[in-house]
UniProtKB/Swiss-Prot annotation:
Cellular component aspect of the GO annotation: cytoplasmic stress granule; membrane; nuclear speck
Protein name: Ataxin-2-like protein
Subunit (UniProt): Interacts with MPL/TPOR and EPOR and dissociates after ligand stimulation. Interacts with DDX6, G3BP, and ATXN2. Interacts with PRMT1. Interacts with CIC and ATXN1.
UniProt key word Cytoplasm: yes
Function of the protein: Involved in the regulation of stress granule and P-body formation.
Sequence positions bearing Asymmetric dimethylarginine: 359
Modified residues (N-acetylmethionine): 1
GO molecular function: RNA binding
Regions of compositional bias (Low complexity) in chain numbering: 361-378, 454-466, 681-697, 935-944
Length: 1049
């Protein structure tokens, strides 16, 4: 008789159904079934009466245990046993102690009884739990049921048991089925399990990929047969999802349906009278006009880019799924960095953004004090351009806090005006000059325009002695200042903010000497600015007026094709047209008033006070003031000149744009150079009067502003000391950024880095401002200064495409003339049709490498009169290294601002170490003695493309001295590039280049000759070699040549 099992054996784990046959047979030796199995729990239930115990022998507990009693049965025991102790590896014991609560707690290993110690048998028996089994008892009767569990005594519990008939009768009757029977081991002869698959649970992988690859999905062994879908005729063109706007139901049909089926009547009115005011249409003229006006406004609104952008954004027009949901996109114009390299798509880390973006603006405002970076018209008077050129960043900062997007050029023009009144040597902090003069436009922070303006560089060599840099020097470095930002240039009479169009569009401003007539504009602008700027005082106003007069209409802004035009709300084309008109006006003024306005006398007196430098005799104060040509490399847009005519339009711009002023006391920071006073930067004479070195040019750090030689200006000296009758060509400090974009942010000019050695202090005041400006702009020469440092006359060609030609002065044998070095991407400084710039530099000027397109820097000399030789600034100490290494004098006590350590080439802004200077000997095998072919001068030959101007400054390394420029040029002619011949003398405005020779000795200023034709200067530092085309004989334009007289030491 079957007996209930103890309570501890009450739970049973379910096992997968077996599919193979397993037979538990009683062995003669009482062994357990050969197959081991997972232990299955045994359920003790009251069983109906079963076969008598004596009927047949059954597998008894002893027999089962005889198969081997191993404590660590690797099986899942029923709840009856606590978790078993695993004695051998792989043993798995899963169980819970239910009935056996030993007082010792769970850690105690369970004790197994009987067959539970036979792990192999338990493994198989538990594996077949739930399978159909036939139990044959001793009386020969076979019972069929579903195996449920077994006890430790091997008592089998079977569910749904019924007696199995000898012959199949179809199925058991319901009354014959017993829910559960327990067979005692003594009664069981044989237990047969049919169709058991012991590998069922392990033969398949249950990972998603394995299941997906399995042909039988969800247990289906047969593949599905696809059936053709019969959609009928309705799947034709009836369903045009795109063109069908009815939304499925016609509103009237819906209302009708609802009324018929639900009794709901609608109150819908298609006119929406409760929400709108009906228009009563009539034929009156007024109504038609209003209707037309409304239609026009609707068209304007719908055609506006902002509207279209918003609609496209709402509708996701033209955007891919990636752009909609996963792409990270940044607005290119939202955050512009001053780096030369355009970073439009790139992520700029926050620290770098903070360094670069506000570089100029914040610092500027703080240093200038009066001029907050954001205020549109900060009182600039307090800050004089000369005085303070805040860190390079200030310029980089958007003018007026304006976005950097403004074209740098536009900003620069404002800079041109300097306050003449500012006391000389005025500390940068205290600028008595009206704010306009003080503030140099900030270069836009935009990545397009790294602050090139001298302001950026300004920290470098502005000499305290010239608190106010001449307008030219004050002008931001060639890096263009965005015109869009309106800068009030105090000196310029505070250019009125340009019309929004101008302000928005980056425009090339060509530097044109402006006539006095424009002074009125400046005065007007000053008055306007004074009214607008609460901080301006009467004194400042007076300064501004003086500066305005001097400044004249300094420059016109020509809309440039600068990359930033997209930023401009107004089309650049309009700006260009306006600028052209203004240029014409300015040109007329220039031609009409070459002499310059009387303001010059005032400026001269001021300059004398400030600089203690004799003013040039040029009568026109209004004479072209020095405006550093914007550095084309930065924006790639043409340089911007200050033009009176444009001032009117610029007035708003000036208001909008804060001016940044250069700090005259700032010292150039050249990590690779010994600290030299960069302050020598020549202060180009103010246009009104040649200020010998009214203010040191402030080097502009372009590109990264990290250029080692931040103050690299090619200085254009507007005034040459000439007979008053002659209008001196304007020389504009042309700041070329030597810094590589990567370098930017390395330092803003270190104000104290270089002792401010002012050449003017050491040199006689007689030195013309040109020399000073040239020397200051040039910076230390690459090569040790020779007794005669010669400047390469840089004659800007009238044609931007033409590189200026370098004309050596044959008569000045010992001094090769070196054109200022421009970067390989030469930029053209074209000042309108009138070339009027002299670029002289002993040191290479590096335009930002950033500009991919070579833009020759053409500084056009306005009309210079060949007959008058002007003395170059004597102030400037001879550059330590002069272009010609042959000169016996190696280094002068007063090193040029850009003096490099011997043998060390300055690094180009491009970031390439400028070790690869072309030394005359090294460059070409051509013997120095070889004279350059005259063809260079011939007008016919022209540079196919603007060639970079290379000034080769031989280091002391230069193997041989060249007796004359011809030799040097020949030695340096490395490439086959042909220099463009200077424009014909007959050209409407032959550009004249002033050759500035740094004084040979500490004392005498060298006299420079202005060759009629431009000379392309090749900078040795630039990677791309450019031939120097110098003809010793300037015979073709002898009249225009100014002889060089070597200054005595």
């Amino acid at each position: 008789m079957l007996k209930p099992q103890p309570p501890q054996q009450t739970s049973q784990p379910q096992q997968p159904p077996p599919t193979q046959q397993a037979v538990a047979r009683r062995s003669p030796g009482g062994t357990s079934p050969p197959n081991g199995g997972l232990p299955g729990p045994l359920t003790a239930t009251a069983a109906p009466p079963g076969p008598p115990a004596a009927v047949s022998p059954c597998l008894g507990p002893a027999a089962a245990a005889g198969s081997g009693l191993r404590r660590g049965a690797e099986s899942i025991l029923a709840a009856s046993a606590p978790p078993q102790h695993q004695e051998r590896p792989g043993a798995v014991a899963i169980g819970s102690v239910r009935g056996q609560t030993t007082g010792k707690g769970p850690p105690q290993s369970p004790v197994f009884e009987g067959v539970y110690n036979n792990s192999r048998m338990l493994h198989f028996l538990t594996a077949v739990v739930g399978s159909t089994c036939d139990v044959k008892v001793k009386n020969g009767t076979t019972y069929e049921g579903i195996f449920k569990t077994l006890s430790s005594k091997f008592e089998l519990a079977v569910d749904a048991v019924h007696r199995k008939a000898s012959e199949p009768a179809g199925g058991p009757r319901r009354e014959d089925i017993v829910d559960t029977m327990v067979f005692k081991p003594s009664d069981v002869l044989l237990v047969h399990f049919r169709n058991v698959d012991f590998n069922y649970a392990t033969k398949d992988k249950f990972t998603d990929s394995a299941i997906a690859m399995n042909s039988k999905v969800n247990g289906e062994h047969k593949e599905k047969v696809l059936q053709r879908w019969e959609g009928g005729d309705s799947n034709s063109d009836d369903y045009d999802l795109e063109s069908d706007m009815s939304n499925g139901w016609d509103p009237n049909e819906m209302f009708k349906f609802n009324e018929e089926n639900y009794g709901v009547k609608t109150t819908y009115d298609s006119s929406l009278s409760s929400y709108t005011v009906p228009l009563e249409k009539d034929n009156s003229e007024e109504f038609r006009q209003r209707e037309l006006r409304a239609a026009q406004l609707a068209r304007e609104i719908e055609s506006s880019p902002q509207y279209r952008l918003r609609i496209a954004m709402e509708n996701d027009d033209g955007r891919t799924e990636e752009e909609k949901h996963s792409a990270v996109q940044r607005q290119g114009s939202g955050r512009e960095s001053p780096s030369l390299v355009s970073r439009e798509g790139k992520y700029i880390p926050l620290p770098q953004r903070v360094r670069e973006g506000p570089r100029g603006g914040v610092r500027c405002s703080s240093s200038r004090g009066g001029r907050p970076g954001l205020s549109s018209l900060p009182p600039r008077g307090p800050h004089h351009l000369d005085n303070s050129s805040p860190g390079p960043g200030s310029e980089a900062r958007g003018i007026n806090g304006g976005p950097s997007r403004m074209s740098p050029k536009a900003q620069r023009p404002l800079r041109g005006a300097k306050t003449l009144s500012s006391p000389s040597n005025r500390p940068s902090g205290e600028a008595s000059v009206p704010p306009t003069s003080a503030a140099l436009p900030f270069l836009p922070v935009g990545r397009m325009y790294p602050p090139r303006s001298p302001k950026s560089a300004a920290p470098a060599p502005v000499s305290a002695s010239c608190p106010e840099p001449p307008i030219g020097s004050a002008v931001a470095s060639s890096a263009s200042i965005p015109v869009t930002s309106s800068v009030v240039d105090p000196g310029a009479g505070s250019i009125s903010p340009a019309s929004p169009k101008l302000s928005l569009t980056p425009t090339d401003v060509k530097e044109l000497p402006t006539k006095e007539p424009s002074r009125n504009l400046e005065a007007q602008e000053l008055a306007r600015i004074a009214g607008k700027v609460p901080g301006l005082q009467n004194e400042q106003k007076r300064f501004q007026l003086e500066e305005l007069r001097k400044f004249g209409a300094q420059f016109k802004l020509q809309p440039s094709s600068s990359p930033e035009t997209g930023l401009d709300p107004f089309p650049s084309r309009i700006l260009k047209e306006e600028a052209k008109g203004k240029e014409k006006e300015v040109d007329g003024l220039l031609t009409s008033d070459p002499m310059g306005s009387p303001v010059s006398s005032k400026t001269e007196s001021i300059l004398d006070k400030e600089d203690k430098v004799p003013m040039a005799g040029v009568g026109g104060t209004e004479g072209p003031e020095q405006l550093p040509a914007p550095c084309p490399s930065q924006t790639g847009s043409p340089p911007v000149g200050l033009i009176k005519g444009d001032e009117k339009e610029e007035g708003p711009v000036t208001e909008q744009v804060k001016k940044s002023t250069l700090n005259p006391n700032a010292k150039e920071f050249n990590p690779t150079k010994p600290l030299l006073s960069v302050n020598k930067s020549t202060s180009t004479p103010t246009s009104p009067g040649p200020r010998t070195h009214s203010t040191p040019s402030i080097p502009v750090l372009t590109a990264g502003q990290s250029g080692l030689y931040s103050p690299q200006y090619i200085s254009y000296i507007p005034q040459i000391h000439m007979g008053p009758a002659v209008q001196a060509p304007q020389m504009y400090p042309y700041p070329v950024s030597n810094s590589v974009p990567g370098q930017q942010g390395k330092y803003r000019g270190a104000k104290g880095s270089l002792p401010p050695q002012r050449s003017d202090q050491h040199q006689p005041a007689s030195a013309p401002p040109m020399m000073q400006a040239a020397a200051a702009a040039a910076g230390p020469p690459l090569v040790a200064a020779t007794p005669y440092s010669s400047y390469i006359p840089y004659n800007p060609q009238q044609f931007p495409g033409q590189p200026a030609m370098m004309q050596p002065m044959a008569h000045y044998p010992s001094q090769p003339v070196f054109a200022p070095m421009l970067q390989s991407n030469p930029r053209m400084l074209t000042s309108g049709s009138h070339p009027q710039a002299i670029v002289s530099s002993s040191t290479p000027q590096y335009p930002a490498a950033e500009q991919p397109t070579p833009q020759a820097l053409y500084a056009t000399v306005h009309q210079s009169y060949p007959h008058h030789a002007t003395q170059l600034h004597g102030h400037q100490p001879q550059p330590a290294t002069t272009p010609t290494g042959s000169q016996p004098q190696s280094q002068h006590a007063a090193p040029s601002p850009v003096q490099h350590q011997a043998g060390q080439a300055p690094h180009l802004g491009s970031g390439q170490p400028q070790q690869n200077l072309y030394h005359p000997g090294a460059l070409t095998g051509t013997p120095p003695s070889l004279p350059p072919g005259p063809s260079a001068q011939s007008p016919q030959s022209s540079f196919p493309q603007p060639a970079a101007v290379y000034a080769i400054h031989p280091h002391q390394q230069l193997p041989h001295g060249f007796t004359n420029m011809a030799h040097v040029t020949q030695a340096h002619v490395q490439t086959g590039v042909t220099a463009a011949p200077p424009p014909h003398p007959g050209a409407p405005h032959p550009p004249q280049v002033m050759l500035l020779h740094p004084p040979q000795g500490h004392g005498g200023p060298p006299q420079g000759a202005v060759p009629p034709s431009g000379v392309p200067a090749l900078s040795a530092s630039t990677p791309s070699p450019y031939p120097y085309i110098g003809h010793p004989q300037v015979q073709s334009h002898p009249s225009q040549q100014l002889p060089f007289h070597p200054p005595g030491n």
